[in-house]
Amino acid sequence: MKNNNKFRLDVWGAITLGTIALYALFLLYPMAYLIRQSVLDPDTGSFTLAYFTKFFSKSYYFNTLINSFKVSITATVLSIAIGTPLAYLFTIFKIKGKPVLNILIVVASMSAPFIGAYSWILLLGRSGIITTFFKNLGIAIPDIYGFGGIVLVMTLQLFPLVFLYAKGALKNIDNSLIEAAENLGCSGIACFFKVVVPLIMPTLLAAALLVFMRSFADFGTPMLIGEGYRTFPVVLYTEFINEVGGSDGFAAAIAVIAIVITTLVFLVQKYVSNKNAFALNSMHPVEEREARKGINALVHLVVYLVVGIAIMPQAYVIYTSFKNTQGKIFVDGYSLQSYQTAIGKLGRSIQNTIIIPLLALVVIVLLAVLIAYLVVRRRNALTNVVDILSMIPYIVPGTVLGIALLIGFNKPPLLISGTMLIMVAALIIRRLPYTCLLYTSDAADDLIGV
């Protein structure tokens, strides 16, 4: 691998400078403007901490932060508790229909938070199909609203991420380690907790960070089913909307608090991961085996049950999309009426929903490949800057990034708020870190030989 410690103004040097310029315009400038607004008195133009004092002195606002921590920590713990054992079962046992189950688990994590929350309202809302079923049997079950519902929806959407991370890490464990543990009398559940979990702990910490960040920044789920249980992103959005046309300082201060919190969580995770980091060399990967009769039935039951519950919202939404409706009420019969209505009334919105992500996807892939090449093959002081800049959006909640872009580009000469450009830019900046991580860890290895 080349080790170019000095910057050279060639083609790759120009690309490096251009990449830094793009980050400076669409990331650093909005974030700096956001921080400026959070400490600027709109009347006098002087420095002030009044907005931060307001947030921490009023229990209404401060409690939303506590609520978000409760939700995020609980969802993270449950996601780890579900995703890790599930990945272990998939790795060591032969399970019928495993390829289909793998696809379904990925699909379960793909729906937007709004869709997931809406789906569970149809199932466990006050008039949901499951709620009504048990009500007819004379059994009262908790509805989906409030803390429990938020945690349920987030967990079922996010445990697949832990599953994918853990499953990848389990492939790197040498089977001889597990065999040695079994020869010493450590097998089954004991082997899982004493041998397997410590070996994949760095990966689990990375997955936990991702789940925590996602759940902490989730706006759609608590907005739809939180009711009286208000979380940090909901209050941030509400305050920003209330301040549109006026001073946006308080919303900016809340956004800065979110950045500080997620940054601290990220740094703690990195510190703990580095303390527990070690290399795994899988000379003899774990081989799938048939479980004993009784265990085999239990394994299949657990796997099918977890995957079935996770995919249930998506399956039910697809099913109801074909049902006939009268207004907001489902009636007997099936047709494509709902699709015709949606395309007729929301054709332009559907078109934008397809075009904007596609444009962002093309740019993300191109930038990720370039950044991976620069970081791996053309490493110098400036490419290190590119590497750091590309990771900043990883720790910035999506709501915060959106507000920063709206505040930063809401006045001439950089007036692009309300345009397709700012939506594409937001998606690129927000999702680029995940693609960069992929390319710099895996695809970059191939670039080394170029």
What is each residue range found by the language model?
Residues 11-42, 58-171, 199-219, 253-269, ...:
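Membrane-water interface segments at the C-terminal ends of transmembrane alpha-helices
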Residues 6-12, 52-60, 216, 222-263, ...:
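Interhelical loop and adjacent transmembrane-helix boundary motif
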Residues 181, 439-444:
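Conserved small/polar residues in nucleotide/adenosyl-binding loops
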Residues 267-302:
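Alpha-helical transmembrane segments of integral membrane proteins
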Residues 184-186, 198:
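Glycine/proline-centered hinge or cleavage motifs at structural transition points of membrane proteins
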Residues 94-96, 171-176, 186-188, 227-230, ...:
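Juxtamembrane helix-boundary/capping and inter-helix hinge elements in multi-pass membrane proteins
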Residues 54, 102, 175, 179-183, ...:
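Short amphipathic alpha-helical coupling elements at transmembrane boundaries
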Residues 40-48, 125-136, 227-234, 276-283, ...:
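Peri-membrane helix termini and adjoining interfacial loops of integral membrane proteins
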